[in-house]
Amino acid sequence: HSQGTFTSDYSKHLDSRYAQEFVQWLMNT
């Protein structure tokens, strides 16, 4: 279960990072 929790947390971190970059991309467009 610990591996699954780590994976979900890691993907959540990536999602937030991509979301921030996506917002910045929208602002620059």
UniProtKB/Swiss-Prot annotation:
One of its GO terms (biological process) is negative regulation of apoptotic process. The modification Phosphoserine is found at residue 2. GO terms for molecular function: glucagon receptor binding; hormone activity. Induction: Produced in the A cells of the islets of Langerhans in response to a drop in blood sugar concentration. InterPro entries: Glucagon (IPR015550), Glucagon_GIP_secretin_VIP (IPR000532). It is found in: Secreted. It comes from Chinchilla chinchilla (Short-tailed chinchilla). Belongs to the glucagon family. Transmembrane segments: none annotated. Keywords: Hormone, Phosphoprotein, Secreted. This is Glucagon. PROSITE patterns: GLUCAGON (PS00260). Glucagon plays a key role in glucose metabolism and homeostasis. Regulates blood glucose by increasing gluconeogenesis and decreasing glycolysis. GO terms for cellular component: extracellular space.
